[in-house]
Amino acid sequence: MKALIETADKKSERAFLVGVELRSQTSWDVADSLEELAELATTAGVEVVGQGIQRLEAPHSGTFIGAGKAEEFAKAAKEANADTILFDDELSGAQARNLEEIFGAKVIDRTALILDIFAQRARTREGKMQVELAQLQYLMPRLTRYWTHLSRQRGSTGSIGGEGEIGRAHV
């Protein structure tokens, strides 16, 4: 079973933490939550090298945080030699991919970090299988469009029949 965050390497991962303060939250809530995320990261064997908080009315659909703030945090993370970015909130698959492009580093949310801690601590065969199942259920919606280059069926624009069949010669 492969963990979401591979911490078995001799070199410890270095993480930059990102939190978002929404209108419904207080700055104390966000600070406490980031402190808890830092403790979770330490438990997973990750060294925290910095953090950033953005105040938002609502999360952005593409990057969760604004693109400008993402660039600012990416610069700070690079200066701190962070190789992992930990978000305090749950990210969609598209948001994580977009952020990985901006940061140039692995982007992980709180749920993935917690699943990794469980994976590291699982001892029994049943426990390991349950953690792996939870990890796969977490990853499944995030794998959308990862292997579209392998697709042989697709409909063309304006086609009435939708997706076509694969010819027997190709099978």
Question: Can you say where each PLM-predicted feature lies in the sequence?
Answer:
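Alpha-helical initiation/capping and key positions within long helical/coiled-coil segments
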Residues: 29, 72, 128, 132-135
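Short alpha-helix plus adjacent loop in nuclease-associated cores
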Residues: 112-131
